[in-house]
């Protein structure tokens, strides 16, 4: 009913950029023939949690899986990005409603340490060393290959450079990725080992074919594994990168940054949208508590970033509180302490903390001068969309500044006495800590920063058009949010017609009364659940959590503020679903998108980004790819309307559920309209 209301009574703003056709992409000729050709049934690009989940399920299904990753660790946000503190919601965690692979990860962490929370942190029930996360996940993939009789081809330090996209004569409505060229780098003899230099100093080299002073390069061509007979698709490429590289390189329709305000995205901070304002990214680091005070050297660049740093809120203005928030190792429990209503154990020598703090090492650019993820227009102007010209799609200078910003934050923690948000007299130095660096440090880098920044937002595809979604499928703010949409903000900032449409969409069966004018928005009762999708293949639950971009350039400018209105949409969300339609891009039939690049809005993406969601979406992608190969169909055929009549879709969902990969939360039904007890 809600979908029909959308279709009949509204259209999305005309500011959306849509590409209706895709020009065939021919591989540019590398400087030499590929050094090796590798056959895959599933090419999973990106070794984060979504990619790991996809590979895990593909291997258990007996498939040949090629997994590429720009760093040399699997796990993404819980390993190479350093955020080794599982973001979970209480009810889902208590009932353990997670995909089987994620549950196995939690169990292996517990077995490895003898407890689930070796860091005794208070942000999560599980904080641990990032490198251990990588080791555990790598072991899980190897075991999955043995158990499912699949084949794992693991390609660390590898990036996709080019794609060949053509029409497949065996079927489908669009084109397909026929092959991919990748570059793998390894240290030259006599050169510094991997992870010596921060990402900003090596990323452009990683996307360059030629050997360099640091790296030898291996050119790899990925191709489909041959089948006995013609298939609708010979293989599947799964987009699981942290920024949506493949959707940019393949040039399928996508969005970036803030979406225009509409009745579907009523809390948007912009009426027209802004592709440059994405959520902040973070280079994490680890610091260890010492028994004696340490001497800390002032970074040359500290004065540039010092005006930014803050505890943010008075109730959080305590060093021990911030330190223990994401403490990842605590061999000896300290005394109990309470500050701002929060209780924790004080740090003791040998404790290790991972830092990830909004007004600390978050770097939050938001203008065309410094945005991290290049827009399509910027990529086109730079020539990165031309064959063989792809360089990763990120602004190297912004990566560099994010690295400096993070190192400066450590110095502020141990030596600083300023606070940009709370003023003088709040921050005092605490020199009993060292910055951990070295290949044997928790981050596994000589420089001490995470191998890759923690990314909260990426390019997000626009799903396929249909009768109900004429502008392309998208999960929007109102599909998951618990906000009170009768708040004065919405009455003031939405037109009367838009305000009425908003409440009609939230009203379920009563929506037509509102649209006809038979009832006012205030007279109807809004639904108290997220939107239910008949093609749901996964689940997630987290708050709509914002780390907004800053208003002015540069982000660290003294007196700079967060983008006005960006936090309006934040708050609690209902448990939500991962529909198959959110994973299928336009134009390309054998590309499945997972992780942070699925078709969700800017505000919804603030919830669709945590560890268990990434795994669930990855498990859905890997299972869908394996199912499509076995059933000799294309994934979009599973959701051709009417979806409710798709027997193959139901078979896919039944396979996921039978494999303990939930497609719904318990008691999900249009008749269960109250999820207020879920926290």
Residues covered by each model-derived region:
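Beta1/beta-strand and adjacent pyrophosphate-binding region of the FAD-binding site
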Residues: 34-48
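Second-shell loop/turn segments in exported
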Residues: 43, 88-93, 119-128, 233, ...
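Bacterial N-terminal signal peptides
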Residues: 11-23
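Flavin (FAD/FMN)-binding glycine-rich loop and adjacent Rossmann-like elements that form
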Residues: 32-33, 155-156, 160-236, 240-679
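Bacterial N-terminal signal peptides that target proteins for export
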Residues: 1-13
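N-terminal Rossmann-fold NAD(P) dinucleotide-binding loop
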Residues: 51
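Conserved N-terminal/central alpha/beta ligand/cofactor-binding core
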Residues: 63-64, 68-176, 184-188, 192
